[in-house]
Structures are given as C-alpha cells and as structure tokens.
C-alpha cells in the first residue's frame, strides 16, 4: 500500500464507543462522543479510557499490531478473514471449592490477563504479589485499572499512522521508521520465573558478584560463594530489597538476566504504574511504558496527544504543540498571537475564560477579566478597585487596609461588622 493510500485511509474511529457513559463524570456526561482531533470526549472532556467502552477486541488488535514483526509473534494470532494480528492474552480461570452446609460449591475466579507461563501455580503466585486493586480479576477494580493502563501506556496513535490526524506522506514514513526502530531496540515482554531456576541455567544467565562471569574464577564462585552472594544476586533491581525464597520474579530480556524485579516493582520509570501485561520498553538502564518511552524520544502534542514528526511545532507553557493544535481548549479557535489563560494546564482564549472560568467579583457581581488585578481571600474575589473592594457596611475602600472577612463580605472595623450582623 503506497503512502498516499495510507493517508487517505486514516480515521480516528469516531463511532467507537459512541454514547458510552463516563465513569468519572457519571450523569454529567451525555455519553462518549470523540472530539474530531483530540483524543477526548466532546461532552465531558475526559479520555476514552474514562468511559465504559467495551474495547477488549480493539485492545487485542492494538497489542497484536505492536507485536507484529517482532520476536513476540507467539503472543499473536492472525485472523483468517483479514489477516489482522490479534493479541493472544493469557486468561487464567481458577476454581476453588467452597464448603457449604449441605454440599460443596465451586467459586470461579477469572483473570482477564495472566503471565503466559505453563506453571499455573507460578502465575497465581505472581498475581497474589500484586496490589489487590491492580489484580485484573474480571469485573473488578483491577480489571478496570488494566483497561485504563492499556489505553494510557500503549496509545494506538504511537504505533499506527492510521490512528493519527492528517499526517503527511513524509510524516507517515518517518513514523513507520520510528516504530520499527523501537520494536527492534526497546520493546520487550517480561518473563516470570523463580530466581533459582534462572541460576540453574548457568553463569551466563545470572550475575555472580566478585568476578567476570567468563572467567574460571567466576564459575567456581557459584559453588564456593553461593551462600555468601545469595541475598545480593536475588535483590530487586527497583527497590533493592531481597527476594524471598520461593517467590517469583520478573525478568526483562533486554535488561539482561542479571536483573530481576518483584512483580509489584515492575513499573514504568516515569509514571510508576505497573507495566500493563508486563510490556516494557528498555532505555539507558530503565524500564518505561510505551507512552513514556516515546515521550523520551519525540515531542508529544499537548492538543491531540500524538507524537510530533513535523519539523515545525510550537512550544508554550512547557509543552509542545502541532502548529494547528495550539487552540483554545473550549472552542478550538487557534491561539497564535491571541491572549489566552491556562486553566488546568489547558490554554483557553480570553472570551471563553470570561464566559466559562472567570471568578465573580463579590462587589459588582461581574466576571473578573484575566488581565485585571484582583483581591482574593479564601474562595472569594474582588476587582482590586475603589468601586468593588469596599467595606460591606460603610463602603470605605479597603485596598491596602486591614479588613475583616465574613462569609463573602468584608468590613473595615468591628463596629461595621456588628451593624450588619
């Protein structure tokens, strides 16, 4: 498929999840409706991951595409109908007999994802070492957490040009090269094993302190100093605490098998969240999720959330923006050369600020212009003028004077306060 055809096929999937309720805003949101270029809901401004959108098949396609053309093709299967790679995530179902008065019932627990290991007891042990609210049990808070992290850590628009907005043919080509590079150099999937099993594979798999692993002395050290170094070689690369005997550890092949992590410590170096499904990116001795690895390589547009492959872009408020995306967060008007106000780290034009966000003056009851000086006390504000910041009793100007605040009113003296009480 040529680049021109790829550009024409691009779309953001606006029908996907349409009308889904927002888990954060509840009834305040009319239902999910994707903004035409931002990755948020037009109604409530929350992301798609905050809405109750059923995306399991779509997420499996996304992760499947991520693993395509990598050594992790065993984790994907291609659909016979269209050849699309699908992620074969390992689902684990545990059955526990529960004793009742008359008979024995079966309690079934389904994990929406589990480490792809043959030893189910090891996978179960791994799950139990995760925080309870992050265990992906179907229908639980942990399953919702996993779903949210899949969307946050592995954005489809970080790997698939067709999920981006109006890329040029040159940008498509550059993005494809970028994706190919990180698949070859950084992408990996964690491996769950018992540390002593790794040691039994030989000195080339485990780090033995006190000598070069290729020397005879180092090999001999395995037998003679195993007890002395046991705590050192089994310490977590993240928290530095010792691994308990018999507990599983997570290994990252790109980091080398001399490093291991507690299951709960296998986290992104930037956001500190669990690496979803143990999918990691390795760079300069650190683990990253997909999003924050890409952020370390390319600027990201604060407007559309996509990586910037254009040579020209805007930097403002310590953030990066496509030239066409430095817009008012409320009305989408371009802000180049215009006055704007930052509201929750989002730029808002002056008219929208006055209409939607400006504080109201307690004196004149009008919105306070963002360029006008004001006086603020607790949650109350006034224009810093002789017409507005006055004693609520005698109308004396209080600018530069001591005052007594009482429930949105201000007084110049105790006498005035008593007269109004």
Curated annotation (Swiss-Prot):
GO biological process, one term: negative regulation of cell population proliferation
Region of interest called Disordered, as start-end residue ranges on this chain: 134-164
Domain LIM zinc-binding, chain residue ranges per copy: 234-297, 299-359, 362-421
Main localization, broad class: cytoplasm
Keywords for this protein: Cell junction, Cytoplasm, LIM domain, Metal-binding, Repeat, Zinc
This protein's GO CC annotations: cytoplasm; focal adhesion
Domain called PET: residue spans: 92-199
SUPFAM superfamilies: Glucocorticoid receptor-like (DNA-binding domain)
Compositionally skewed regions (Basic and acidic residues) per UniProt: 155-164
Keyword Cytoplasm on entry: yes
A Gene Ontology molecular function term of the record: zinc ion binding
Keyword Repeat set for record: yes
The organism's place on the tree of life at top rank: Eukaryota
Subcellular location: Cytoplasm; Cell junction, Focal adhesion
Free-text domain note: The N-terminal and the C-terminal halves of the protein can associate with each other, thereby hindering interactions with ZYX.
Family, similarity comment: Belongs to the prickle / espinas / testin family.
Subunit annotation: Interacts via LIM domain 1 with ZYX. Interacts (via LIM domain 3) with ENAH and VASP. Interacts with ALKBH4, talin, actin, alpha-actinin, GRIP1 and PXN. Interacts (via LIM domain 2) with ACTL7A (via N-terminus). Heterodimer with ACTL7A; the heterodimer interacts with ENAH to form a heterotrimer.
Function text: Scaffold protein that may play a role in cell adhesion, cell spreading and in the reorganization of the actin cytoskeleton. Plays a role in the regulation of cell proliferation. May act as a tumor suppressor.
Protein name, as recorded: Testin
């Amino acid at each position: 498929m040529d680049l021109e055809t790829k550009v024409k096929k691009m779309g953001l999937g606006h029908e996907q999840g349409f009308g889904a309720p927002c888990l954060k805003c509840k009834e305040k949101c009319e239902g999910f409706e994707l903004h035409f270029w931002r990755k948020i809901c037009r109604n409530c401004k929350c992301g798609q991951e905050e809405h109750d959108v059923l995306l399991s098949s779509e997420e499996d396609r996304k992760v499947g595409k991520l693993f395509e053309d990598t050594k992790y093709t065993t984790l994907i299967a291609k659909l016979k109908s269209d050849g699309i790679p699908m992620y074969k995530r390992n689902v684990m179902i545990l059955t526990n007999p529960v004793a009742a008065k008359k008979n024995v019932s079966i309690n079934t627990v389904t994990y929406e994802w589990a480490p792809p290991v043959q030893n189910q007891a090891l996978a179960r042990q791994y799950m139990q070492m995760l925080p309870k609210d992050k265990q992906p049990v179907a229908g639980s808070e942990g399953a919702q957490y996993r779903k949210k992290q899949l969307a946050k850590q592995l954005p489809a628009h970080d790997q698939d040009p067709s999920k981006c907005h109006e890329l040029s043919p040159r940008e498509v080509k550059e993005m494809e090269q970028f994706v190919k590079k990180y698949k070859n150099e950084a992408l990996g999937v964690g491996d769950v094993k018992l540390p002593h099993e790794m040691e039994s594979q030989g000195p080339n798999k485990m780090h033995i302190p006190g000598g070069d692993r290729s020397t005879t002395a180092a090999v001999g050290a395995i037998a003679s100093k195993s007890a002395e170094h046991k705590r050192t070689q089994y310490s977590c690369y993240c928290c530095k605490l010792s691994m308990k005997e018999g507990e599983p550890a997570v290994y990252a092949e790109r980091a080398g098998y001399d490093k291991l992590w507690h299951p709960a410590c296998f986290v992104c170096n930037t956001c500190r969240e669990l690496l979803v499904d143990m999918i990691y990116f390795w760079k300069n001795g650190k683990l990253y999720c997909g999003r924050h690895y890409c952020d370390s390589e390319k600027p990201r547009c604060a407007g559309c959330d996509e990586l910037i492959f254009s040579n020209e872009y805007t930097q403002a408020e310590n953030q990066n923006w496509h030239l066409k995306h430095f817009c008012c967060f409320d009305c989408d008007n371009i802000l180049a050369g215009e006055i704007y106000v930052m509201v929750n780290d989002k730029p808002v034009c002056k008219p929208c600020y006055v209409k939607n966000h400006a504080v109201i003056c307690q004196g004149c009851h009008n919105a306070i212009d963002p360029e006008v000086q004001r006086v603020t006390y607790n949650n109350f504000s006034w224009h810093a003028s002789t017409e507005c910041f006055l004693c609520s009793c005698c109308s004396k100007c209080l600018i530069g004077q001591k005052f007594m605040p009482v429930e949105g009113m201000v007084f110049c003296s105790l006498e005035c306060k008593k007269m109004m009480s």
